Amino acid sequence: MDNCDFSGYATRNDLLCGDGVTIRKDAFKGNDGCEVPLVWNHEHNDPNAVLGHAVLENRDDGVYAYGVFNDTEQGQTAKKLVQNGDVRSLSIWANQLKKIGKDVVHGNIRELSLVLAGANPGAYVDFVMAHSAEGEEEMEVSWDENIMLYHSADTEKKGENKVAEETIKEVLD
């Protein structure tokens, strides 16, 4: 999409989300081409939390979003946060969900939020366009798989914190 301020995955398919659900392919295909509000942290009750809008594109691996910030103070602040890489995570709010077990197979995306940490590990900004006052445009492209760092202090030492491996039957007997 031309003239977007940023783009990235609103949600990715087949990844276990922090809320315990997994979004499956084409669950939101009905939103392909739709424009939804871009909101700060799912704040639905505050009009000042609306930062702009996003156009959604259904893809084989998820729903991609092209975001445009509005010219409000909040919209421009959010734009700077995204341009600086301070906020990179995206999150959807959807309703009319149909699930098979913990798999979301259908739904309707109502808004896209910029969040500090999203539930879907594949939902993040991967492209930022910077528009200059002279009319020139610059872009930053990144590929971020939200890498988890494990420090040596986090690893379990042999013999410490060993979890008992008893069956339920053994515990009840």
List each language-model region with its residue ranges:
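Polyanion/phosphate-binding surface patch
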Residues: 43-44, 51-55
